[in-house]
Amino acid sequence: MSQVNTSQGPVAQGRQRRLSSLSEFNDPFSNAEVYYGPPTDPRKQKQAKPAKINRTRTMSVFDNVSPFKKTGFGKLQQTRRGSEDDTYSSSQGNRRFFIEDVDKTLNELLAAEDTDKNYQITIEDTGPKVLKVGTANSYGYKHINIRGTYMLSNLLQELTIAKSFGRHQIFLDEARINENPVNRLSRLINTQFWNSLTRRVDLNNVGEIAKDTKIDTPGAKNPRIYVPYDCPEQYEFYVQASQMHPSLKLEVEYLPKKITAEYVKSVNDTPGLLALAMEEHFNPSTGEKTLIGYPYAVPGGRFNELYGWDSYMMALGLLEANKTDVARGMVEHFIFEINHYGKILNANRSYYLCRSQPPFLTEMALVVFKKLGGRSNPDAVDLLKRAFQASIKEYKTVWTASPRLDPETGLSRYHPNGLGIPPETESDHFDTVLLPYASKHGVTLDEFKQLYNDGKIKEPKLDEFFLHDRGVRESGHDTTYRFEGVCAYLATIDLNSLLYKYEIDIADFIKEFCDDKYEDPLDHSITTSAMWKEMAKIRQEKITKYMWDDESGFFFDYNTKIKHRTSYESATTFWALWAGLATKEQAQKMVEKALPKLEMLGGLAACTERSRGPISISRPIRQWDYPFGWAPHQILAWEGLRSYGYLTVTNRLAYRWLFMMTKAFVDYNGIVVEKYDVTRGTDPHRVEAEYGNQGADFKGAATEGFGWVNASYILGLKYMNSHARRALGACIPPISFFSSLRPQERNLYGL
């Protein structure tokens, strides 16, 4: 946006400025709720004030102004507005359009430009890339052209959003549809996407939140809530919600005190949402107290629950947008899950009760604590203490206990309990694995699934297959050839880096907030900060012994069953930097040797092509392998490299990732997806692996993006200076941007 000239002389500065047109008090970049709200409805404006909407003054009018009124404008360049010039530069982006009929314009736009009929306008569409729209000054009588994929796709998005607000006519600022893409994407993430992804349980929305699109069985047709056995207030709340909305057929059930793998399997056919933390609210109109859930964010797409490690990544982005209440709510929910379900769950559905996800609670609680005001806020201190108490319980009872702990190495593995076939996968996901067993027993595939789940057919090899499959899903990296058939036996660098971080964080917490003495309410044991630091030191030594490969510069996973270090080159090696467990020498070798193997056009690949191996019909591509890149890998690597003094490398990697996201956003109708192909410069969002790409299936306008990808964009921009931001806005590829830099500027990117 242009800068306002404030040095216009004493008369100009002292004179009260008169609002002469609508554009002077309407923000073209305001939230959709404001921009398309009732006050901006053209039909209402016509009734109240039928003339002179956003009248642009010509030079002839200005020349007739008295010398007194010209005071302070002497430094402004006077340019005449061309009567037929419809270029952006001629108007400086200040024009406004009048869309007399939103539906009609929307249909005309799609008919002319959406040639592949997917309700999006992209560079792959072959339309004329131009559309005439009416001017606001003439109330649509005169027309000008909107040109190009980016502006037309933004017009489609704005018309779609306006229609969703029930608008039939709109004024539309040119600046809104030709906004710098970096600014537009940032604005949408902070003001729209986070709001669309935020959930908060109340009496009126329980049924909608409880719906599950991942499972299609007779028992899953009705929404269902499972409540911990010791939460009677919540049980009564959900029963009340069910009674208030009988048409929803909401079912409410208590969970048993002891949750076993057998119990979890028994309710796979009747899955339900698991209750989360709630707080009391006082209703001033009724004088009654009621429960309401703490807010939380969901990843998006088919993932409509509170997820484990997604929530930490999203919390970082939410805090940047000052949505502290949502980030804080997710910490509350994790405390609740540990206290009532025994662990931070993969997600809050009944079929996830045996399965956790990568642990980030200590760091998550710390960043929320700081945002809440730290020690100066008693509520923040209370939250931190409860979060660390829960984290210590999780550390002891989940990650350093059987079956996840390997007693010989002292390292931990993704090794969840569970029985049967995971029900949340696509119905045919395991068919190729199960078909030989069905043939062996002379039954159909569906019959075999039922017999196996019921325990009437025993197949030890199949049991082991699903043990590792559940481990893969607990790791958050579902799926990858890195873990296939071995996950539960692997002491991974990612998990053990996180546990090292837990140990360091807990040591600091005990020293700072517990007078260096912590009594665990679980087992009444007493620990000090020195004891936790010693545990961290021991883990660090074991990680180096079993996982570090000096020659390659990678931390590799260690197979505890065959007692052998693997050689799968994964981006999770940089988690050792994020956790702070690597030595300076190890960090240097990682940057010199490991990084070049993983750094691609669009950032870090999940693994190297060599490690992934060949792809064929019988060996299909996996989404957590090369050539795909994921937001959490970028976020943790950026912070890890920065903390070890490699900020310039972080700048380079962040530019690559942000370029890829921005390019897809500009060329493909504002798309933001779960993962990207970091080797592709044209359509990196196009991922044909497993269940496709969440965030790509929308009509007209993307309203959610994808949780941790949204966060990665906002976090990545913190590493960009103004020069880099301008280059991103112009979609300049990394190779062109880096090669055009002066020598001193190249140093900023580790080149």
Swiss-Prot record:
Impact noted for substituting S475A: Abolishes activity
Pathway(s) per entry: Carbohydrate degradation
Gene Ontology process terms (BP): cellular response to desiccation; trehalose catabolic process
Annotated localization: Cytoplasm
Modified residue annotations for Phosphothreonine: T58
Residues carrying the site annotation BMH1 binding: R55
Catalytic activity: alpha,alpha-trehalose + H2O = alpha-D-glucose + beta-D-glucose
Bias-annotated ranges (Polar residues): 1-10
Function description: Hydrolyzes intracellular trehalose to glucose. The disaccharide trehalose serves as a storage carbohydrate that is mobilized during nutrient stress. Regulates the level of trehalose as a protectant for cell integrity during heat stress.
Protein name stated in the entry: Cytosolic neutral trehalase
Lineage: Eukaryota, Fungi, Dikarya, Ascomycota, Saccharomycotina
